[in-house]
């Protein structure tokens, strides 16, 4: 239990499932204070210049969300049980925390920002970051949370707009693990395996290498992405930066929602032409098939945790600045006290980023992509002390090299089904690189 305002509130639920031994996990004594503040400016403009790209955190959509800086605590894990280890660690932190929260809203009090690798055997594993300072906005309400360890809070501060970040200099892009032509050949091979009955769908990703003459400032990327892609969740956690249109799971007071995207077409910039393309996307048997696999996998994963799950009969077309997606919002009422992170673990990897059947598609990805996805297509987001939170899928993103911040890897992927055309899939992947490429070269 921990103190919130003048109330004693139970901390994270304790599922009955067996957890890894927690004896080796240190339990820090965390203290947090949340107060209401006047709106200090656009959230992303408050992020200060720091010693490295991993020192800022953000989760913002249309001006609302959370930003943080500094590190009061951090946790890393790897392996198949990385989600369980992270959940156990956060629960132990919350159990021993002393919190004064004047608002008691989702995202107030102590918050952990997190990102998780796509693959269980990736060395990138899991990272949870608890910033020293968090500023949040929800509607007209704004708040400041300061967090410290061993009863030491950061000194009093008033959030203010920071000097603007600098643009990257002399940005250069080059092929990653595979060239475009090589990746197209991999897609053709995957289609052959699908037509042979090995699987129904596989999501194949590719990467681009980025080199610059200066350190890449995640604040620059965040601000450029937010300006152009206001219908996405703009994020940075531990040097991973992007703008995802796909909410893996949002949990608030027992209601869980998940936005599923699968099926994509590139926009032309001509409104009339784009409306016609949207109509064709909504009728495309190839894209509808791909979308159905993704929706079914999310609904099946949520069902054991919920008393009911609502799945709309047909998807809608989500219009972004550069592409359009088939989208479905799945919702349910959670009855087993699962946290947002536990639900994210149940959903990952969904058919939207892996394929169908998932175990077979996962093996095919390892064989065909010839790279480690790192945290691309893994869960990214935040969780508060109650277990509520928001976890997106790390899409339209890149990872800044912690050893050399002038370097970065960008990622994009496409769902491959029996009707996929390699050249069209390559063009789609190029379109999905556009948000990060444009953000890097906007200066």
Pin down the residues of each PLM region.
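Cytosolic ligand/metal-binding cores
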Residues: 2-32, 37, 138-161, 250-329, ...
């Amino acid at each position: 239990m921990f103190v919130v305002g003048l109330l004693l509130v139970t901390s994270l639920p304790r599922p009955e499932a067996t957890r890894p031994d927690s004896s080796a996990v240190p339990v820090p004594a965390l203290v947090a204070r949340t107060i209401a503040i006047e709106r200090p400016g656009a959230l992303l403009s408050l992020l200060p210049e720091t010693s490295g790209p991993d020192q800022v955190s953000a989760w913002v959509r249309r001006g609302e969300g959370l930003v943080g800086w500094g590190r009061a605590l951090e946790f890393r894990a790897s392996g198949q049980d990385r989600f369980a280890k992270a959940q156990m660690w956060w629960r132990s932190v919350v159990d021993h925390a002393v919190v004064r929260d004047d608002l008691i809203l989702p995202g107030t009090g102590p918050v952990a920002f997190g990102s998780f690798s796509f693959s269980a055997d990736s060395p990138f594993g899991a990272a949870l970051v608890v910033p020293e300072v968090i500023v949040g906005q929800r509607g007209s309400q704004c708040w400041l949370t300061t967090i410290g360890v061993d009863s030491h809070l950061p000194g009093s501060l008033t959030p203010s707009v920071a000097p603007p970040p600098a643009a990257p200099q002399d940005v250069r892009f080059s092929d990653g693990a595979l060239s475009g032509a090589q990746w197209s050949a991999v897609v053709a091979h995957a289609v052959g395996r699908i037509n042979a009955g090995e699987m129904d769908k596989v999501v194949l990703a590719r990467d681009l290498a980025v080199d610059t003459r200066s350190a890449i400032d995640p604040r620059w990327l965040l601000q450029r992405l937010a300006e152009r892609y206001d219908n996405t969740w703009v994020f940075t956690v531990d040097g991973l930066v992007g703008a995802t249109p796909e909410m893996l799971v949002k949990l608030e007071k027992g209601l869980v929602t998940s936005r599923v995207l699968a099926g994509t077409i590139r926009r032309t910039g001509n409104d009339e032409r784009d409306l016609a393309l949207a109509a064709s996307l909504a009728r495309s048997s190839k894209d509808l098939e791909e979308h159905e696999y993704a929706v079914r996998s999310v609904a099946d994963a949520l069902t054991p945790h919920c008393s009911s799950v609502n799945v709309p009969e047909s998807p809608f077309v989500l219009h972004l600045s550069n592409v359009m997606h088939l989208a479905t919002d799945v919702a349910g009422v959670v009855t087993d006290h699962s946290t947002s992170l536990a639900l994210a673990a149940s959903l990952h990897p969904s058919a939207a980023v892996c394929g169908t059947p998932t175990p077979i598609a996962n093996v095919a990805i390892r064989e065909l992509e010839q790279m480690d996805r790192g945290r691309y297509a893994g869960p990214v987001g935040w969780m508060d002390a109650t277990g509520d939170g928001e976890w997106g899928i790390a899409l339209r993103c890149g990872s800044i090299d912690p050893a050399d911040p002038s370097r970065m890897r960008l990622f994009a992927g496409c769902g491959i089904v029996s009707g996929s055309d390699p050249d069209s899939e390559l063009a789609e992947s190029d379109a999905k690189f556009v948000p990060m490429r444009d953000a890097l070269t906007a200066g």
